Amino acid sequence: YKWDMGWMNDTLHYMQTDFPWRPGNYRMLTFSSMYQFNENFILPLSHDEVVNGKCSLITRMPGDYWRQFAGMRALAFYQMTHPGGKLNFMGNEIAQFIEWRYYEGIQYFLSEQYDTHRHQQRFVRHLNRFYNEHPTLWQRAFESDGFEWIDADNADQSIISFIRRGDDPKEDLVVLINFDVNAREDFRMGVPEWGVYEELFNTDNERFGGSGVLNTGKIKCQDEPWNGREQSIVVRVPPLGGMILKKTGAQRRPAKKTASSGAAKAKKPASKAQGKKAAE
């Protein structure tokens, strides 16, 4: 195994970039897919990134407190859904503001005294549990057939989406991450299969300190090609957050009208006289 220092540097550089300038740095999010399966990579957010004046992870996030914590959730979510192993240094799970000092302990009292840090700790706990309970995220973490882009070109909106595949095709997961501060209503995205989808995880859940832009209930496919897929769905996209969707049910697909069927309906049947003449 090898630490993917390229992923770490590109990702942290992108996350430190203020929101208006993120579209111009979009390729820092997607470049890792050019080499991510060349070796067995581990995605490190280690002690090296929070010492010697580099500051803690959360203090690198642009914006006010809410956006900084939302950025921390988006970063952790991106790391967890990205192919490869995961490495996190202690203190990341509570979003400690001071960088690590070898002569001091981690400030775990923050999660006891402040809701924002408690929400962050709860988020990381639930994200870790979700990861463990969904083998799709780790069964093929080092194999190219375990990952497929849906959209790696939406720089203007700072959104990426992809598919994670495991050993069971029925357990495939669709991941979307929005690195912009604006929520998106009625956002259309292509999906790999026709059917009914449900949201399994959303970083913007209010219990994690989010704003509550969720997708509740069933999400039905529409016969509208999108992102190179034959079908698509319309979802709510959380601000500075991500979500995981899964196909959970079947749905009857509407019959497509063809040119031949339309011509057949338009053609008038021959009259009896015409039929008799043809027979002669």
Q: Residue spans of the language-model regions?
A:
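Active-site rim elements
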Residues: 58-69, 107-118, 229-234
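Acidic/aromatic-lined carbohydrate-recognition and catalytic surfaces
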Residues: 174, 178, 227, 240, ...
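C-terminal beta-strand-rich structural cap/linker in extracellular carbohydrate-active enzymes
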Residues: 216-254
